[in-house]
């Protein structure tokens, strides 16, 4: 199969079986598929209990409804990674615009900023469209993207994309039950939502 036709979402949604168990065969394959230990770092982040997804919901919802809305609805949400040290800052992720506030992601653009070529010319060119069913792989087919998608990826973007752009089953596996390691929190108060943006985002 040609790399341009590879459906990452279809593969990553098989990370968790129907019985809510990690599929070790898929985990091993993904380890080989992604470069420079990216999968290992993203998977470690998924198991770190440092990932939070804050969801704005003016009307309170049950926990399962809240998770389903992240796949079946269009809620306003903020994926955030808790700082690891006292001097660290929270990492904010925006999957819709493929942006992360971490230094690793910023470093991918830095060489283009110091060069003579404008950033838009350095990173963009016409490309073929991606498979419309492959939410996770859409980065590779963004109109005009020149840079290698793997270079515009960090562990935070990868981990949240695994949770939010593959299958609801994967999100449930990591965010529900006694062993939950990713926290999905609904916010119903506009004051609390604004405080989140002032204090974290």
Curated annotation (Swiss-Prot):
GO CC annotation terms, alphabetical: nucleus
Domain of life (superkingdom): Eukaryota
Subcellular localization: Nucleus
Keywords in alphabetical order: DNA damage, DNA recombination, DNA repair, Nucleus
A GO BP entry: DNA recombination
Family to which this protein belongs: Belongs to the SHU2 family.
Physiological role: Plays a role in a RAD51/RAD54-dependent homologous recombination repair (HRR) pathway to repair MMS-induced lesions during S-phase. Required for error-free repair of spontaneous and induced DNA lesions to protect the genome from mutation.
Record's protein name: Suppressor of hydroxyurea sensitivity protein 2
Gene field: SHU2
